[in-house]
């Protein structure tokens, strides 16, 4: 049985801008997001603006691609949604992006259920 999850990507002041559904989020940990941010940093280079850690929808799109590429057939269980409300999810994460370009990864929290 999979553990469904949602990941909300918000602006620095908490406004929802993009959301992702992950069918198998049971194995997600803070290290999962650290690995994702490290991949973005490695692949996008050292210029903070290019990392887009301040751009929720851009970062959400990269997260979908990263999820789809990290495990065999993982692309079958990840997708873009309008928001976490109304989705039956066992786990809900929020990625709060920065106000301005930064090389520091965004803050990730797991919402209490």
Q: Where are each of the predicted segments found?
A:
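Short, extreme N-terminal segment that most often corresponds to the first beta-strand
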Residues: 1-26
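A cross-kingdom marker of C-terminal helix-rich interaction/assembly modules
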Residues: 34-36
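Low-complexity intrinsically disordered segments
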Residues: 39-113
